[in-house]
């Protein structure tokens, strides 16, 4: 006999009444509902009532003071509407980054994440390497640390990302990328979340506020630690791999393919975190931890709507796990990332093309994403409902929803438990799929 409190919830215009618990229990019947719509701009599909709240902050508050990295964000910037190429005159300017030598000072346009305003940040060139320049605008970073960052990029990160994703652009014709190391102004002190780094596509064009070169921006505090007198530059190496993927992605989509916008953000971020995973050669535990604790994910957070409900950290967690599921299911492993990136089709079509080639020629993208949601719960060693035994992913632990919503956003999903089997309602929306997992 079950003694726990029960919740009776109406599903889809009273076509189904089921008894749900407020927590897990023995001999439960477990179901996953997924909205298989792959159009991120589509209307939500009907299934029940959701009282929305500040899921992101409630999740952060419940996790403090755990792994700080769980709250790291990567600011996403859209490509500029005007895409004026950088001119030879701009490249030859005495203030161009490409015309710099060691210990030169240049002024960069940076973004204040608190206000979203542009600012000027003066930085000194502290490493002039084969493939990268490291600029420092933080008195707590030593010359040795700047050199360590540059050498790690030149020797490990650069060849890895080029092999797995492709080549960066070279808009200033110097064959290098620039890494600006400074304390990004973010909301860490007030919310606990912070910006670990960013890449801005405007830098690839001759437009207002552009730095007219390949630049990505790396945070010192708190990304390298919360003791400013003892910062650890190694903590941002994986973020370097993350941001570099964004730069390579932008080169492919914006410059080579001449697209108005780049790859859909959710998949671009998935690839960036896959880049981190490959560099570290281990799972991103902080993303798994956030997934396991996320109130918004339990309540139907969308995989493909970026910053859904204002909880971008849940999107990072879902995108990361999707990248690992995709490579686990593909018959060519992580080579599938580069293949998708270099497919000129739109994001959904490129993904489905790769799934047809490397997973199942008859499976739709929506069906693949439903299998992904099931895999998060079942984690089977082989087959569609797991990660093929990939180490470290068995710690994934989705939470059952406490109250079923009436609607799910495109690629939103919930898991729920009942005391007895249910019948799938006949009047559910067409793209809503129910799967019994236990």
UniProtKB/Swiss-Prot annotation:
Residues 1-26 form the signal peptide. Inhibited by metal- and zinc-specific inhibitors, such as EDTA and 1,10-phenanthroline in vitro. Is resistant to all inhibitors of serine, cysteine and aspartic proteases. InterPro entries: Peptidase_M30_hyicolysin (IPR019501). Coiled coil: none annotated. Optimum pH is 7.4-8.5. Keywords: Hydrolase, Metal-binding, Metalloprotease, Protease, Secreted, Signal, Zinc, Zymogen. The keyword Lipoprotein does not apply. Binds 1 zinc ion per subunit. Its cofactor is Zn(2+). Zn(2+) binds at residues 242, 246, 269. Several different N-terminal ends may be produced, the favored N-terminus is position 102. Its EC number is 3.4.24.-. Protease that has a low substrate specificity. Catalyzes the hydrolysis of glucagon, melittin and oxidized beta-insulin at various positions in vitro. Is not able to cleave elastin or the synthetic substrates FAGLA (a substrate for neutral proteinases) and FALGPA (a substrate for collagenase). Belongs to the peptidase M30 family. This is Neutral metalloprotease ShpI. The lineage of its organism: Bacteria, Bacillati, Bacillota, Bacilli, Bacillales. The gene is shpI.
């Amino acid at each position: 006999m079950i003694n726990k409190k029960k919740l009776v919830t109406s599903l889809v215009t009273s076509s189904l009444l089921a008894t749900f618990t407020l927590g897990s229990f023995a001999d439960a019947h477990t179901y996953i509902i997924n909205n298989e719509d792959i159009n991120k701009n589509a209307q939500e599909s009907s299934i029940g009532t959701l009282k929305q709240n500040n899921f992101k902050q409630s999740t952060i508050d419940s996790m403090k003071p755990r792994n700080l990295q769980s709250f790291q964000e990567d600011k996403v910037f859209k490509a500029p509407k005007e895409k004026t190429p950088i001119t030879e005159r701009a490249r030859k300017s005495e203030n161009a980054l490409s015309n710099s030598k060691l210990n030169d000072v240049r002024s960069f346009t940076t973004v204040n994440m608190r206000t979203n305003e542009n600012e000027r940040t003066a930085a000194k060139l502290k490493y002039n390497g084969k493939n990268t320049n490291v600029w420092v605008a933080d008195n707590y970073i030593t010359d040795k640390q700047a050199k360590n960052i540059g050498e790690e990029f030149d020797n490990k990160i650069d060849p890895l990302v080029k092999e797995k994703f492709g080549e960066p652009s070279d808009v200033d014709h110097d064959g290098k990328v620039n890494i600006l190391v400074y304390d990004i102004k973010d909301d860490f002190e007030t919310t606990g979340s912070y910006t670990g780094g960013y890449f801005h596509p405007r830098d690839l064009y001759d437009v207002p506020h552009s730095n007219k070169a390949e630049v990505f921006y790396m945070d010192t505090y708190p990304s390298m630690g919360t003791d400013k007198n003892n910062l650890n530059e190694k903590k941002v190496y994986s973020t370097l791999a993350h941001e570099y993927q964004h730069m390579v992605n932008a080169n492919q989509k914006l410059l080579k393919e001449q697209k108005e916008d780049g790859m859909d953000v959710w998949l671009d971020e998935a690839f960036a975190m896959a880049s981190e995973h490959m560099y570290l050669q281990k799972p991103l535990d902080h993303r798994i931890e956030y997934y396991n604790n996320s109130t918004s994910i339990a309540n139907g957070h969308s995989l493909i709507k970026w910053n859904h409900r204002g909880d971008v950290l849940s999107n990072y967690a879902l995108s990361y796990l999707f990248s690992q599921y995709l490579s686990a299911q593909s018959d060519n492993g992580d080579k599938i990332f580069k293949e998708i990136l270099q497919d000129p089709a739109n994001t959904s079509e490129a993904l489905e093309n790769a799934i047809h080639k490397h997973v199942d020629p008859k499976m739709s993208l929506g069906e693949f994403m439903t299998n992904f949601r099931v895999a998060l719960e079942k984690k089977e060693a082989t087959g569609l409902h797991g990660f093929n035994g990939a180490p470290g992913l068995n710690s994934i632990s989705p939470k059952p929803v406490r109250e079923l919503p009436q609607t799910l956003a495109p690629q939103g999903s919930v898991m729920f438990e009942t005391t007895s089997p249910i019948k799938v309602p006949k009047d559910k929306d067409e793209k809503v799929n129910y799967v019994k997992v236990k």
